[in-house]
Amino acid sequence: MHFEPALDCALLQKRYKRFLADVTYQSGDTGTIHCANTGAMTGCATPGDKVWYSTSNNTKRKYPHSWEITETQQGHLICVNTIRANQLTVEAIEQGWIKELSGYEQLQTEVKYGHENSRIDILLSASDRPACYIEVKSVTLLDDTEPGQGFFPDAVTTRGQKHLRELTEMAQNGSRAILLFAVLHSGIEKVAAALHIDAKYSQLLKQAQKAGVEVLCYKAEISNTEIKLNSAIAFNNS
């Protein structure tokens, strides 16, 4: 994924009301940008961090600038725009970067499925194999005690729990079901379920794996010009 036009940078003052952030632009002026992330953003929104933002062509938008990447004061790059996780995963599948998901004939997004009124992020299909249901989760929480350790989720997620139940049902019914962690933090080298944050999610994930749900972890190469989801890393839910 290339950023066209190129991203601009500013310094973060504060994030608030979940969807907004005040920044200081390179000109010295201050302003408010949109934050497409409803999560806790732990470690991703420290005042003084550098913010890389895109600019919308829509002149009717109240906040034309969107926060895409955080460059932390420790030098890490983090894609905080949660919309990008699905886009990057679709690109990675189409480019053949995720070898476990090669060979399918059709790719669909946001398809209704399950008994809990869900929409699957990505549905792959082919004439010679079962359908493949893929739920994508963005990982940006870096542990501050163990180098390289990332966790998901960063807050209790009832929505994520629902998705695990739906994936489990798909696997039990004979479809291929995959939970794909899109690691969008340059400092994360391995991923684990955050038992200390959401014990129910960790429990449901173990049950899902026993039922046949596969877990894939792919890490993105991140720069202020391009992001590519193309490197497999380890997952642990022991």
UniProtKB/Swiss-Prot annotation:
Highest rank taxon of the organism: Bacteria
InterPro entries on file: SfsA (IPR005224), SfsA_C (IPR040452), SfsA_N (IPR041465)
Molecular function via GO: DNA binding
Signal peptide limits: none
CDD domains in alphabetical order: SfsA-like_bacterial
Gene3D superfamilies per UniProt: 2.40.50.580, 3.40.1350.60
Family in the record: Belongs to the SfsA family.
Name of the protein this chain belongs to: Sugar fermentation stimulation protein homolog
Gene source species: Vibrio vulnificus (strain YJ016)
The gene coding this protein: sfsA
